[in-house]
């Protein structure tokens, strides 16, 4: 395993997006021209104090007013390293305790990273929440039978579940977890290959379901890049 004490951590804030989708990057949004110019959302919205946006603006898009948690965002510490041909990504976070209790009876907590490719529109700019959730179950006007988009091959979902039944993982992927007080650490390990190789910037996102949340009732990140082998990226996968 990598020596995490020698690897710098990048803090990424995850937020409860409510029922918002790609309308945040439409022409009515003041930052639309910046997105069209190829700049990511974090250029404007990420600050040293976390995400800079008004959480109350999410409320009108939330059909269930009681679903909005008191804690609308929280930080996740992200580290990455390449060791012996394997990419390791480590998430460390303190899940909020005031989220509305969800419907997942089997898992109190879930954490996931999504590794995206160019098939997902706006992946490297805004993050997967702008592209994947507009017509899914739980969204206003969404299809109750439509779940994840994994089968389309547009992104790779690496998920950890706190319950007794482990999440299904792609071949060559392992996950480990630990807990220190109220802080949870999850480490994903994936063999290099396919779209995830040295020299490539891999767009990725984070999703965390807290307090037995299910479906879209999760906290998500904006779009970031994982720089492997010195490639450009907000999170660098250092070689050990």
UniProtKB/Swiss-Prot annotation:
Post-translational modification: Binds 2 heme c groups per subunit.
Keyword terms of this UniProt record: Electron transport, Heme, Iron, Metal-binding, Repeat, Transport
InterPro entries, per the entry: Cyt-c552/DMSO_Rdtase_haem-bd
Sites where the protein binds heme c 1: 41, 44-45
GO molecular function: heme binding; metal ion binding
SMART domains: EB_dh
Pfam families reported for this sequence: EB_dh (PF09459)
Binding site for heme c 2: 128, 132-133
Signal peptide: none
Keyword Iron: yes
Miscellaneous comment in the UniProt entry for this protein: The second heme binding site has an unusual CXXXCH motif.
Record-given protein name: Cytochrome c-551
Organism: Rhodocyclus tenuis
């Amino acid at each position: 395993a990598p020596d995490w004490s020698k690897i710098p951590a990048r803090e990424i804030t995850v937020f409860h997006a409510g029922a918002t989708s790609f309308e945040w990057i439409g022409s009515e949004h003041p930052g639309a021209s910046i997105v069209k110019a190829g700049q990511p959302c974090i250029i404007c919205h990420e600050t040293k104090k976390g995400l800079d946006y008004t959480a109350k603006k999410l409320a009108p898009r939330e059909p269930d007013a009681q679903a909005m948690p008191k804690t609308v965002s929280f930080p996740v510490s992200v580290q990455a390293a390449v060791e012996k041909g394997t990419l390791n990504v480590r998430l460390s976070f303190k899940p909020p305790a005031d989220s509305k209790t969800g419907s997942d009876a089997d898992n109190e907590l879930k954490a996931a990273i999504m590794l995206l490719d160019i098939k997902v529109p706006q992946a490297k700019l805004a993050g997967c929440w702008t592209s994947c959730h507009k017509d899914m179950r739980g969204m206003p006007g969404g299809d109750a039978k439509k779940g994840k988009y994994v089968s389309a091959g547009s992104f790779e979902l690496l998920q950890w579940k706190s319950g007794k039944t482990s999440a299904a993982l792609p071949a060559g992927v392992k996950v480990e977890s630990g807990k220190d007080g109220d802080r949870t650490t999850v480490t994903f390990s994936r063999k290099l290959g396919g779209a995830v190789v040295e020299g490539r910037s891999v767009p990725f996102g984070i999703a965390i379901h807290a307090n037995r949340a299910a479906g879209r009732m999760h906290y998500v990140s904006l779009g970031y890049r994982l720089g492997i082998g010195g490639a450009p990226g907000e999170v660098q996968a250092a070689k050990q």
